[in-house]
Amino acid sequence: MSLKVIPCTLTKNQEVFKCVSAQLQYRRGEEEHGSGPIIHRWRPNGHTVAVACANNTVIYYDKKGNVIDALNPTGKLIDIAWDKEGDVLAIAVANTGTIYLWDVNSRNTDTVESGATSSKELPTCLAWSPSTPTLVIGNNAGNIVVYNHRTSRRIAVMGKHQRSVTQITVTPEDYVISCSDDNTLSVTTLEGTTVSTTTTNGEPTNMDYGSVNGKGGSGVTMVSVVIGKKILMLAHYNALDEPVNLQFQEKYGNIHSYRWFNDGYILIGFDRGYIISISAHNNEIGSELVSFLEYRGYLASIAVSTSFNKLLTIGDNMVKVRDLDELTTVTMLTEIETEKNLSEIEVTEDGQLVAVSSQSGVLSIFVTKMPTLAASYNNSICYLTNLTQVTVVAEVEKKGSSTLELNIEPTVMGLGPLNLAVANNNTVFFYDYHTPAQMQAAQQLQSTQSAAEKPTIVAAEPINRVEYLSTVTNIQLNYMYAAVNFGSRLRLHRIRNSEDNVSIEFPEANRNATLYSYALTENFLIFTTSNNYIVYFSLSEWAIVSEYRHVVPVRSIFPHPTNVVCCCFDDRLEAMIYSAVDDEVFRLPSVGSSAHYKGAIWETFTIDKNTFAVFDSQNIYVFLLSKQHIQGESVIYVSATRLPHAYVPLSLNKGIVTCLMSNGKLSSVLLDSHKTESVISDKSETVIDDILTRSLLMHRWSTAWKICIHSNDGSHWNQFAMAALLDSDVGMAIKIFREIGDAAMVTALELIETIEEKNLLHAQIYTILSRYDDAEQLYLESSRPMEALNMRRDLLEWPKALVLAETMNPKEIPYLSKEYAQELELTGDHANSLANYEKGVMENPQNLPELQEHNEICQSGIARMAIKTGDLRRGVQLAKQLEGRVVKRDCAIILEQMKQYTEAAQLYEVGLFYDRAAAVCLKANAWAKVGELLDHVKSPKIHIQYGKIMEKEKKYKVAVKCYETGRDYDNQVRLLLDPLNDPDEAVRVVRESRSIEGAKLVAKFFVKLGDYNSAIQFLVMSQCVQEAFELAEKNNAVREYAKAIEQHGNISQALELAEYYNRVNDMFMAAKFYTQAGQYNNAINLLFKNGDDENCVALAVDCGIKSKDKTLNNKLVKFLLGEDGNVKDPAQLFRLYVGLGRTKDAAQTAVVVAQIHQAKGNYRIARDLLFQMHQQLREKMMRIPLDMNKSLMAIHSYIIVKALINRKETLLAARLLIRTCGEIQRFPTHVVPILTSSVVICTQANLKKSAHKFAAQLMTPEYRPKIHEKYKKKIEDIVRKGGNQKDLVEENTPCPICDDLMPAYAMSCDNCKSLVPYCILTGRHIVASDFSRCPHCEMPGFYSEFRKLSILNENCYMCGGDLKGAIPEDAKAYLEKMEQDYK
């Protein structure tokens, strides 16, 4: 019968929830019992029930509702009761004084009389003692009969009540509690002694007792009884006359029934459906702890199961079950639709079955607590769904199931891929659960309803039945075999009967051990024994293939479904993983308490097949068996997941643990380690860290990648990379480090990515991770053990490298010894360093340079260490023998530190370290030796020290020379003045050295001589300014003082002097020192007052340039332009513009100045001015304006014509004159002479057309009168004859920039549109193949022309400098700079 889900209402807070209903086991009604109320009592410690029927029959039912036996006493049945063992049922019958004692085992019936004095006394109630085989009977005469069934002794207790005994009970202490309708209550011993008695105010009913813990933890028996249906009386069993009467709210109604529970608490049910919980403890007696309305119609009865920890109630045609620890929650609700008037509910001692009866005589038996019985195979599970029904879920994640109806109640189950095995006692039944008929039935059912809603129920027939020698305790199956544990034996046999029917039992007789545990996989039977063995029995070989002896017995094993590893728990309470391949044992990381581990389950999903979980009663601990880990096969702890109460894990698939609950049903728990987060953007950093850690532990790289991309946290990327490396996934590690930009790690990993050898690859990874000891071990186990030595060498771990070299490559020992010796030398271990240096020396018969260098290093080390260890003679001798200077210096330093100055000086001198040698000799007071070395000494300090020594010895000239060499000018001047009396030399030294102290000495010397001008100068140099000024003022030598301040003074001194001159009205000098002091406005204002003085104007320009003050300079420009009515020399304005970096303005001014000189006919002056401006701009890295450059070219072209004519370069001169005539406006005072010369020279150069042109120009009325008589007739003839003549074609030469041909005298290229520099010697544009520059002014020209003029001893036409240093140069570099300059 399936479970129904019924909506239930909790009346206290009107919360609606869902709970399951109890399963109906069977129901018997009026047909069996007759019509009317019945009495039913569960047999103690069992699941059978006795029913006193309305038809006066006592029926004894088994667990399935079958009648075991029946008894038909004569008369109406009024009460029945079981003895404490459940062997004898006492039956009370009305209208007769006989009590029937029915032995249900032997089926015999005895009788006992209920009358105390006569047979007319009729029984009214009876009860058995819970501790002895004693029956107590109450009768209608108020008497009590005590009957011991074992001894057949009968005791009549009379006079306890005056009227009929209505209820009787016996406590565990054998006190008889009885009540009567005479309103009395009595406690009596079995011998009839009255313990306590009392009279109540109403009729006592529902009498009971309970135990309440008193002081010290001892239990006190309390008697409870309902008085008049309203009051619950509580009293101590020996003090009934001191009761506590409890009354309750009127709304509850009358007390219907109540039950004691949990040591001193009472549940009371009222007829109006209310149930309350109160306490009987002294400090809270009567306190209502919980109250709720259970039924709205009526409440019929309540029962309490302490083993089940439940409250069971009936009413309103329902059965409700609540947890005693949480009474506000209904855990089970069952509707009884067939009956309307329920009367009584009773539960078995184990809480598994509940009997509910009605007024009409119907008895319903419900299953409220199924036996928690289940088994699993990979991800298939079978579990008990009814006492004789087993549900098989073939694949848990597919939600499909089928239920097999059995003929027995199984106590043990086993599940395989195709079969189910169930056992009861020593018999095992095997079933198929994947038969075609079952599958067809399941498909038909699923076409109409979901398999999840109702499983397929099949009446199964066993395919095999096997009996064993003792009770079966465990069954395990695979495809073909069954392994059954009975007693201390294990039998392995086929599931189905076959012809060979092979079977074998373990442990074998010769093993002399008992079975501890076992497990069955597809390929192996694995079992453990008391003598510590784990044994693998191969099913294919049918033989034992592996035996491993552990240190202690293994109490349980849980094998991997497909691999040869298993999880084991041993008697030391340790958990481990055992691998049968190599007998390796990996202990599980310490998590939780291994003493409480209950079992282990392996992941059945292929991707996570190396994951397994160990569980206790509270948690599931997830581990990973890592086979690719760099440390080898190992167990990694992943995480823990809380296990709900009373959940027993059965299988693990895709991170979901399927568990058996305490109610016999299945439930699932998702492991925290397998929880995946589809959205991580809203997660906290802590949660993201946790998810990343789980993903890395489970090797879920894709999830880890998404997390790291989201967080973009360097620590997350590094954690990811380390996990990948430790798992030998170099490719993933490269991807990670490339993502975070770690080029060094990417490069390092790419070098090892292609390594296929496992040990070598892992060693390289360990090296990268700085785990060098592990790396060395793996290198040595790899095919390239020398890598271990190389690694130690790279790490400078010389002792370890030497150990490796001794066995692997002894030839490396000298080299390693040398390195180790150097390290020991640095750490101060000189003795061991010496020993290693000596080991490092190698024979070199062939004088190989490499070995020679190596030996020199070792021998140098030997020399040093010999000295440091006290063997001075050996060390010094060896140092002198070695060729190098360094060893001599090093050994000498050591000797010097040891105060062995003589030996140190010798080595310094031999090593040509003269300064050090002299210094050591000074320490040794070897003055003569210092004198010998002094010519080689460069240290000023040594010279000064030696000079002081010579001075003491009055060798002043030698001392002066030493002071000069040591640059101790103060002492040198002192000796030169006195005692050597050489003031001229002293003055020279002071002027060159700028020595302040020396200047003071010289000043004092000149004061003594009366040379105040010199004294003032040297006083200023020595910063004795005030003294110098007073001396100057006193001796009318302020001008000399001013000169000294100008050269050596600071700002404050210059300012004081300026104010002095201002006071004496010397404006120029005041302005000069204001300028030096930075007081530019004061200086300018004074200079403007003397604007006619050229010196003042020049100083004003200097002041403006220094100030960099825009306002002041604008004011100065206006002043220079004649704002005061007096225009100043434009050259000063030009100088100002140049100094201020105003290139354009400076160029314009220069052109203007040049034009002024041109207008006066001073062409060379104009040219020189423009050239000077050109050079200044170039020196200041300033742009040279095109106009200025063009003016300079035009004037310079005219000036060099005379020189060309003198050199007979007529054509060149003519071409330049043509250029000059093109710029004739630049030569206003010499127009006629220039035109005349042009006519003459062009005629000579056969440039007839140009000559005619210029001659015609002279014939104009403006110029004709000014023509010289000598040339007038000739010019007239040229004009008359000319007109059709032509000039010689101008030569084309390549452009130095683009190499395109252009006219030789053109200054711009039509092709590249570039300005081309001109030759300062010929006026033609330069060419790249014949380029040079003047060595002095660096102006360009033809190298051939420079060379020609140099041979003629002529100078540069531009600057007048010597041309002998001109050399061919690269025109391209010059042109690139010119392009920048002439923009």
Swiss-Prot record:
Q: Where in the cell is it found?
A: Cell projection, Cilium
GO CC annotation, single: intraciliary transport particle B
Please describe what happens when the gene is knocked out: Defects in cilium morphology and mislocalization of intraflagellar transport proteins. Specifically, phasmid cilia are shorter compared to wild-type, ciliary IFT A complex proteins such as che-11, osm-5 are mislocalized, and the transport and accumulation of the ciliary IFT B complex protein che-13 is impaired. Mutants also display a strong osmosensory (osm) phenotype with an aversion to high osmolarity, and they exhibit impaired chemotaxis in response to volatile odorants such as pyrazine and iso-amyl alcohol.
Keywords, A to Z? Cell projection, Cilium, Cilium biogenesis/degradation, Protein transport, Repeat, TPR repeat, Transport, WD repeat
Effect noted on mutating G361R: In jhu616; the mutated protein displays abnormal accumulation within the cilia. There is also impaired retrograde transport of IFT complex B proteins such as osm-6 along the ciliary axoneme
WD repeat coordinates: 32-71, 72-112, 118-157, 160-198, 337-376
Q: Using the record, list the residue span of the signal peptide; answer none if the entry has no such feature.
A: none
The record's TPR repeats, renumbered to this chain, cover: 756-789, 810-847, 885-918, 940-973, 996-1029, 1031-1053, 1064-1097
List the InterPro entries. Answer: TPR-like_helical_dom_sf (IPR011990), TPR_IF140/IFT172/WDR19 (IPR056168), TPR_IFT80_172_dom (IPR056157), WD40/YVTN_repeat-like_dom_sf (IPR015943), WD40_repeat_dom_sf (IPR036322), WD40_rpt (IPR001680), WDR19/dyf-2 (IPR040379), WDR19_WD40_rpt (IPR039468)
Q: Which Gene3D superfamilies match?
A: 1.25.40.470, YVTN repeat-like/Quinoprotein amine dehydrogenase
Q: In what tissue types does this protein appear?
A: Expressed in ciliated sensory neurons.
> Domain of life of the organism in this record?
Eukaryota
Q: Name one GO biological process term.
A: protein localization
Subunit annotation: Component of the IFT complex A (IFT-A) composed of at least che-11, daf-10, dyf-2, ift-139, ift-43 and ifta-1.
PANTHER family found in the cross-reference section: OSMOTIC AVOIDANCE ABNORMAL PROTEIN 1/WD REPEAT MEMBRANE PROTEIN (PTHR14920), WD REPEAT DOMAIN 19 (PTHR14920:SF0)
Function of the protein: Component of the IFT complex A (IFT-A), a complex required for retrograde ciliary transport. Moves along the ciliary axoneme and is involved in the assembly, localization and the movement of other intraflagellar transport (IFT) proteins along the cilia axoneme. May also associate with the BBSome complex in order to mediate ciliary transport. Regulates cilia biogenesis, morphology and sensitivity to environmental cues.
Q: Output this protein's name.
A: WD repeat-containing protein dyf-2
Q: What is the lineage of its organism?
A: Eukaryota, Metazoa, Ecdysozoa, Nematoda, Chromadorea
The gene coding this protein: dyf-2
